[in-house]
Amino acid sequence: MSLRNRLFQLTLVVLSLAIGMQAQDTQHCSNATLHGSYGFHATGTGFVAVGRFVFDGNGGLTGKLFIRVPGTNIGPLEFTGTYSVSPDCTVTDNWLDSTHVSVIVDQGKGYFIMNVSPSTAAADTLNNGEGRRQ
């Protein structure tokens, strides 16, 4: 095989990979991307929580959480809230008087979440959380 043919084949492979990567980067999300039931866990300093969220695909959510802080079990806490998904697959939600930001992963099969409500260093216990579609 000539050098010219090899370069042509290499160019086709690189071009195909670039197109495939661009297709993955252009995923567009909406409220409908986040729908159904998701198992949830979060950990922090002196804090752990597990629970379940149900997203309706239209910006509404319900949840049930069980929380453990040193020496105390809290819950179940049942609540409702709202969420908004941006085209870049980031999420802002509000529930239990807190605001959170999330990133949808794995084509809507999960998300990573962080509490962004105003707090003090002493009260800031949530480090990270994750939800997975059930």
Predicted features and spans:
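N-terminal secretory signal peptides that target proteins for export/translocation
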Residues: 1-5
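Bacterial N-terminal signal peptides
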Residues: 9-18
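Mature soluble binding/inhibitory domains
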Residues: 22-134
